């Protein structure tokens, strides 16, 4: 199975990390979730509806759409909060990345554990920039909103391509493809990881600083 890999890069102020990451992760999971399956008999099932809601960011001029699931939101906020704290405590330049990996399980014979086979991975590289003035922060608020909008549009375009998705499972195999542990939504199986890095490249950060500098010069 070929695993599709997508990489995004963002440059944000420290207080924008959480909102930017939640916007990206929620957007991806919005397109990788279904309503709960309700099986009538093997081979016959109905799919529940998925509620959605708008989220207005406090530190970015941006509004994104997420699945209306408090359980899913709490799970994402927990790991994003850990990532934000790790960035803040790194003592470096605020470089890091988060990865959202979708996978399906392949049953193995006893005594071996099930094999997890990834089929799509989203990686978001993050560079936190330090700003000196409130004027710079206001400009960054607007510019990050514009850049984040571009990233979200890119995600939607990628999701619209007719590429691999796991086939709909039978009732006995649904847990090999979907996370059935949530009460109100059923995302494809996924896991999120993050790391703090020493070197990430400066192209995105340089672009953001240039945008702020050019705007101040107007």
Curated annotation (Swiss-Prot):
Organism taxonomic ancestry: Eukaryota, Metazoa, Chordata, Craniata, Vertebrata
Region feature (Important for interaction with ATG13): 152-156
A Pfam match: ATG101
Keyword Cytoplasm: yes
Record note on quaternary structure: Interacts with ATG13. Associates with a complex composed of ATG13, ULK1 and RB1CC1; the association with this complex requires the presence of ATG13.
Biological process according to GO: autophagosome assembly; negative regulation of cell population proliferation; positive regulation of autophagy
Subcellular location: Cytoplasm; Preautophagosomal structure
Keywords noted in UniProt: Autophagy, Cytoplasm
Record's protein name: Autophagy-related protein 101
Entry's Gene Ontology molecular function annotations: identical protein binding; protein-containing complex binding
Family assignment from sequence similarity: Belongs to the ATG101 family.
GO CC, alphabetical: Atg1/ULK1 kinase complex; phagophore assembly site
Native source species: Mus musculus (Mouse)
Gene encoding the protein: Atg101
Transmembrane segments: none
Function: Autophagy factor required for autophagosome formation. Stabilizes ATG13, protecting it from proteasomal degradation.
Chief place where the protein resides: cytoplasm
